[in-house]
Amino acid sequence: MKNYQAEIVAVGTELLLGQIANTNAQWLSEKLATYGINMYNHTVVGDNLERVEQAFQLAQSRSNIIIVTGGLGPTADDLTREGFQQMTGLPLVEDKESMEKIEGFFQNRGRTMTPNNRKQARVFEGSTVLNNKAGMAPGMYVHYQSCHWFFLPGVPREMKHISQEELFPFLEKVTGKQRIIQSVVLKFIGIGESTLEHTLSDLIEKQTNPTIAPLAQDQAVVIRLTARGETKQEAEAMLEQTKKLILARVGEHYFGENEESIEDIVVQQLQDLGYSISAAESITGGMFSQRLVSVTGASNVFAGSFITYQSRIKEEVLEVPSEIIHSQGVVSRACSDAMASNVTRKIQTNLGISFTGIAGPDEQEGKPVGTVYISIADGDEVVVSKQFNFTGNRNHIRDRACLKGFELIYQYLKSKS
């Protein structure tokens, strides 16, 4: 079985300037992995003929499947064809069917076609034209010096259409049967990346197949498991075996997989238990509620919230006793507990969660920036009451408080199920 090494070359100065994200490469890499094709390199090059040619030469020297996205349009800075022609000397010819399609596009809309649009119908002599039903510029396949070159439009909608209709079936014919690659992302909360890696260090050091890759994300610590097998079932069985070994050590921090978020899981937990929840937010200013309602089905479990930012509103709306506010302050365990209890009672939910704290830039009530209190009430009883000292800028502290709130609810509901 031949070992194929794939590379994506994305052409476009707008990618280098950060004006748009290279989502094409992410999507293609994910899809190609399911075909057992190893993606070794991503290259981004601007709209400069010499640099485009250099990028192509480098790709030719180290890869045998090369997918080029972008640079197939009608303008002078669309230089993919020219760069490849300069490297290979292959002549460009006009594809009759593509040209008729482009002419028909303008005729049907009563518009005059400018001469530069003919450029979009030019393909390399002897190439296989990849039909673009979602746009005008066709894709191309060229076999050059033992390398398989695929040229696709840069517009994501067109690139995906050609890939699904033409590229992937063509690749299967070109490469034959490859070993299947399957991946799963395990998500953890309440544990740092370094602690997680240390706990699993012997498994990571011995990894071969599946591979184990710890990663840090904004809202979770994740482990990506990747297995390679002769069949999908074989690869999935290897993933499941390794997953069991990992969860035997850090299962208490595990909450979900792949695209699942902590708020997705919390909503599901609430639904499974038949619980409703409300929120009283001060430091988070509605962030918790916003994240919760982003989940489909949240209306079944989330009744509403109060954003009580000022002390007066905490006292008037949430009925936090004035003696607590004046003696212990609004950034206190007593205030947080009262907020959680009272929002539960006022909105009439099973659970209530509260957030109060100091996001900065200045300290408050003699307490440092980053001081946060989070409480959870279950009916008349405060069941969780925690103090945290977060670091970072204002919004980072608020984000961490919100995430910690989801973690506390998740752990509490987990203990109830």
Swiss-Prot record:
Disulfide bonds: none annotated. PANTHER family: NICOTINAMIDE-NUCLEOTIDE AMIDOHYDROLASE PNCC, NMN AMIDOHYDROLASE-LIKE PROTEIN YFAY. Belongs to the CinA family. This is Putative competence-damage inducible protein. It comes from Oceanobacillus iheyensis (strain DSM 14371 / CIP 107618 / JCM 11309 / KCTC 3954 / HTE831).
